[in-house]
Regions:
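Short, solvent-exposed secondary-structure boundary/capping segments
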Residues: 42-51
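Phosphate-recognition beta-domain surfaces
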Residues: 54
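Structured beta-strand/turn binding interfaces of compact recognition modules in eukaryotic regulators
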Residues: 27, 36, 68
């Protein structure tokens, strides 16, 4: 089940450690990015899952992350492979403004629910 931006605006969901808009770092590969959506478990198919270099447990939250300075890439990452980025620095990504209104105190601020436009993950 995909948890979209609007689903988490009302409060926390149990088991999900990283809020939408939080800048995170991949603990194995070191890249930074911003969380834009969350699945409560891995929803990718078996072919995709088996093709990864690692296969973290599927029964945990998985995050859709816009990758910093990647030319517009996004990734799908298991919670166990992420940590909060404490640098306080924003990320550079061409779709960041589609999801977020501002960056303040190390966290991207979600756009209002009534904002026009739709962002694809």
């Amino acid at each position: 089940m995909l948890i979209r931006l609007t689903d988490l605006q009302g409060g926390a969901t149990p088991g999900i450690h990283y809020d939408l808009g939080l800048v995170v770092v991949h603990t194995l590969y070191g890249y930074r990015g911003a969380v834009v959506a969350v699945d409560i478990r891995c929803m990718a198919g078996d072919t995709w899952y088996q093709s990864n270099k690692t296969q973290p447990p599927r029964e945990q939250p998985w995050y859709h992350v816009l990758v910093h300075e990647s030319g517009g890439l996004s990734t799908y990452v298991a919670q166990s492979n992420l940590a909060e980025d404490t640098s306080g620095d924003p990320i550079e990504h061409p779709r960041i403004a589609c999801y977020f209104a501002d960056f303040k105190d190390g966290l991207y601020q979600l756009k209002e629910r009534n904002s026009s436009g739709s962002c694809s993950i």
